[in-house]
Amino acid sequence: MIKRMSGIALAALLLSGCQGLLPRGETPSQPPAPTTPAKPSVVPTPTPPVVTPVPQPPKMTSVDWQGSFAPLIDQLLSAPGVEAGSILLVDGVQNKTNGQLSMANASEVLRSALAGNPRFQMVSTAQLAQAKQSLGLAANDSLGSRSKAIGLARQVSAQYVLYTTVSGNVQAPRLAMQLMLVQSGEIIWSGKGPVAL
């Protein structure tokens, strides 16, 4: 009888598909589906980002400083009331236009144009730098105002200050010069003219 029971149990086990070997509560897993090789998909190339151009800085307008200063210097040298040999402080040329001008050598051209005449004795750049340093200003500091220029002129014992500005539209700038008496701050001569571009 034991043989018979074992035979029945074995047959039942074979017929049930071996589900009896699994622990309780588990279900047999599905056989894996057959895999097919994946076809490579075409990846679209990304479009490059839109690059906005960097704006160019405004162009500096070049200036013929010597040609611009010449007529005004002629007027200045013939101005009445200026004693020959007077000490003159030339303030740096100020750009007060609505744009950028090549101002790098403007003050130097102005000093050079005035240096050779006997009407004025120029304050040297070394004296000017030393006076600026004693007042706590940088050597390349542009004074920017008439009162600062007169204060500096007193420091170097100058009798006159030449204050020069370029103003107006950068496409057609105007040059203005003022000769001031240091003692009183009075403008004793002024002249205006176009800037030669």
UniProtKB/Swiss-Prot annotation:
InterPro entries: LpoB
Annotated lipid attachment (S-diacylglycerol cysteine): 18
Record localization: Cell outer membrane
Gene Ontology BP, a term: peptidoglycan biosynthetic process
Tagged with keyword Isomerase: no
Molecular function GO terms recorded: enzyme regulator activity
Main location: membrane
GO cellular component entries: periplasmic side of cell outer membrane
Positions of region (Disordered): 23-57
Biased composition (Pro residues): 29-57
Membrane topology: Lipid-anchor
Lipid-modified residues, N-palmitoyl cysteine kind: 18
Pfam family, one: LpoB
Superkingdom in the source lineage: Bacteria
Signal peptide annotation: 1-17
Keyword annotations from UniProtKB, A to Z: Cell outer membrane, Cell shape, Lipoprotein, Membrane, Palmitate, Peptidoglycan synthesis, Signal
Function field: Regulator of peptidoglycan synthesis that is essential for the function of penicillin-binding protein 1B (PBP1b).
PANTHER family for the chain: PENICILLIN-BINDING PROTEIN ACTIVATOR LPOB
Family to which the UniProt record says this protein belongs: Belongs to the LpoB family.
Quaternary structure (record): Interacts with PBP1b.
Name of the protein this chain belongs to: Penicillin-binding protein activator LpoB
Organism of provenance: Edwardsiella piscicida
